[in-house]
Amino acid sequence: MESPRLRLLPLLGAALLLLLPLLGALAQEDAELQPRALDIYSAVEDASHEKELIEALQEVLKKLKSKRIPIYEKKYGQVPMCDAGEQCAVRKGARIGKLCDCPRGTSCNSFLLKCL
């Protein structure tokens, strides 16, 4: 003695479950087809911005070329000399990096990181 409404309820639920993915796919297609706002950036602004960046890069490259160290001044595998009382090392966590060599009679203090 089931009522006709109880028989229709499972059928309506199954139909709804079958239609939900189709509705979601349609909504997703509409979202994908919407054009993006690319007209915010005009071609003129991009060209002028690129020119500015290129000019700045060329200036930096010119400065780097002028600061080259002559080959006879390069000392591979050596660090420069520093004065007494000057910072001779850098601490990064548990590691200590050497910045320069201390002069004779002094050594790099591992606590103060200075030539003492």
UniProtKB/Swiss-Prot annotation:
Pfam families noted in UniProt: CART
Localization terms from the record: Secreted
UniProt keyword annotations, A-Z: Cleavage on pair of basic residues, Disulfide bond, Neuropeptide, Neurotransmitter, Obesity, Phosphoprotein, Secreted, Signal
Record PTM Phosphotyrosine, positions in chain: Y41
Domain of life: Eukaryota
Primary location recorded for the protein, binned into one broad class: secreted
Phosphoserine carried by residues: S48
Molecular functions per Gene Ontology: neuropeptide hormone activity
Signal peptide boundaries: 1-27
One GO CC term on file: extracellular space
Intrachain disulfide bonds: C82-C100, C88-C108, C102-C115
Coiled coil regions, renumbered to chain: none
GO biological process: adult feeding behavior; cellular response to starvation; chemical synaptic transmission; circadian regulation of gene expression; G protein-coupled receptor signaling pathway; intracellular glucose homeostasis; negative regulation of appetite; negative regulation of bone resorption
Function: Satiety factor closely associated with the actions of leptin and neuropeptide y; this anorectic peptide inhibits both normal and starvation-induced feeding and completely blocks the feeding response induced by neuropeptide Y and regulated by leptin in the hypothalamus.
Family per record: Belongs to the CART family.
UniProt-recorded name of the protein: Cocaine- and amphetamine-regulated transcript protein
Source species: Bos taurus
Gene assigned in the entry: CARTPT
